[in-house]
């Protein structure tokens, strides 16, 4: 490759949750879960218990990620099941990312078990990218006890596609001159970011492989999938992606809170009080900093340990708790499909000066002013007497609370401002 071209690595932990549990057990002299039929999953007696990670021997029994643990046990009665351990996953993820960060000037954390490295300009240190990838892969295995795949290319899309090739413990390249040979023959469902609905639409048009999509006219793809989605996926099929590797998100600094649950959250009646308390905490913090937000994001984590995030841009910036909560609940209802949840979070970004307000001719100004006075009254009570001295009734009546962390942050802000 040319020295002026970008060089991107994508590193993905192989069966992360199972591998991390296995590494711990091996260090304790216990059997390696990767070598026996095993899985990480919930309690088989619970309806919501599912397989979130499985070993290769378990896969040979037909056990699938996402299926009920009870079904997996019917397929393999001697299946070893271990419970999820969030503290272990966080510890292993941090150690994994620390090693990756030591290899490149810029690292982007893509998920708990994936990172992108921008290796551009490191040719004097690592003249052979493949050798460098092997060095990184082997260092992780040697020091942490689990394996990774490394994908190498000139952009993030192709690097991630490459890391999904044969597993485990492999290094793969997918440079632009390798696309036709390595990527185009793959089934269309293998294309990164292609959803099931778009896949079905393409199959209905006779598009079976990534190469079929790449060779199709862009205008046809846009007609089938919509202008924006169609254009993006057509470009992806041709290996085109100019997104940068970002060490931090490029969104404006904002306020956020997340709540992790020991037990599954399964009903919308459980979710709404949690969202209200989160929005209440964040809006209070934001008003104390004299800010308003233009963007509201809601994140939730399902039993496969993947976060789903969705956001909405507001027509006018706001700092009102009720407005933020209404938008957060709308977002959640639009995107939640009823899966059991282990985490819910809200983020407020796109911050503006709180003293500026854009007026609308059609806005219910009387109702808005009433809500503003309510927020101001609650803010004053909390500032004078403490954050726990006043709480909304719907939150008090709920047994799901967001915990101490967010409120501790509010307490610290009180101290700073006094």
Question: For each predicted feature, which ranges?
Answer:
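Gly/Gly-Pro- and Ser/Thr-rich, intrinsically disordered tail segments characteristic of DNA damage-repair
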Residues: 1-232, 238, 242, 284, ...
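Short small-residue beta-strand/loop micro-motif enriched in glycine and branched aliphatics
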Residues: 81, 306-310, 355-357
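A glycine-rich phosphate-binding loop feature that marks nucleotide/adenosyl-phosphate handling sites
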Residues: 154-157, 235-238, 292-302, 341-352, ...
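Short, charged/polar surface micro-motifs in flexible loops or helix N-caps
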Residues: 14-16, 44-47, 303-306, 351-354
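DNA-contacting surface of Y-family translesion DNA polymerases
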Residues: 2-3, 190, 198-341
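C-terminal hydrophobic structural anchor segments
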Residues: 318-319, 323, 329-383
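Short, hydrophobic beta-strand segments
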Residues: 115-121, 309-312, 358-364
């Amino acid at each position: 490759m040319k020295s002026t071209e970008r060089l991107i690595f994508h590193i993905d932990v192989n069966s992360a949750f199972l591998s991390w549990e296995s590494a711990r057990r091996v260090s304790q002299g216990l059997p390696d879960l990767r070598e026996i039929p095993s899985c990480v999953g919930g309690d088989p007696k619970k309806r919501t218990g599912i397989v979130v990670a499985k070993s290769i021997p378990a896969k040979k029994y037909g056990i699938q990620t996402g299926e009920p643990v009870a079904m997996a046990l019917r397929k393999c009665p001697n299946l070893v099941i271990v419970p999820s351990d969030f503290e272990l996953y966080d510890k292993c993820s941090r150690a994994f990312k620390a090693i990756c960060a030591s290899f490149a000037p810029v690292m982007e954390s893509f998920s708990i078990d994936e990172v992108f490295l921008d290796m551009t300009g490191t040719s004097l240190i690592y003249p052979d990218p493949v050798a460098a990838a092997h060095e990184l892969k082997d260092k992780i295995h040697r020091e942490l006890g689990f394996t990774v795949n490394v994908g190498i290319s000139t952009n993030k899309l192709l690097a991630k596609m490459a890391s999904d090739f044969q597993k485990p413990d492999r290094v793969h390249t997918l440079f632009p001159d390798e696309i036709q040979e390595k990527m185009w023959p793959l089934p269309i469902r293998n294309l990164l970011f292609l959803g099931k609905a778009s896949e079905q639409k393409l199959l209905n048009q006779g598009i079976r492989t990534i190469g079929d999509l790449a060779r199709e006219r862009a205008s046809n793809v846009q007609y089938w999938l919509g202008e924006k989605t169609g254009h993006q996926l057509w470009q992806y099929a041709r290996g085109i992606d100019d997104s940068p590797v970002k060490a931090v998100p490029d969104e404006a600094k904002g306020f956020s809170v997340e709540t992790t649950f020991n037990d599954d959250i399964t009903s919308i009646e459980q979710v709404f009080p949690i969202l209200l308390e989160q929005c209440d905490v964040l809006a209070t913090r934001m008003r104390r900093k004299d800010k308003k937000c233009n963007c509201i994001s809601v994140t939730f984590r399902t039993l496969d340990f993947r976060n789903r995030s969705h956001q909405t841009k507001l027509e006018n910036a706001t700092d009102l708790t009720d407005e933020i909560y209404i938008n957060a609940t709308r977002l959640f209802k639009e995107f939640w499909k009823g899966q059991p949840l282990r985490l819910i979070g809200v983020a407020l970004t796109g911050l503006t000066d709180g003293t500026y307000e854009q007026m609308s001719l059609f806005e219910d100004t009387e109702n808005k002013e009433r809500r503003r006075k309510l927020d101001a009254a609650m803010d004053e009570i909390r500032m004078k007497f403490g954050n726990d001295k006043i709480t909304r009734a719907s939150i008090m009546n709920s047994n799901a609370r967001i915990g101490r962390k967010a409120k501790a942050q509010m307490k610290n802000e009180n101290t700073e401002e006094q």
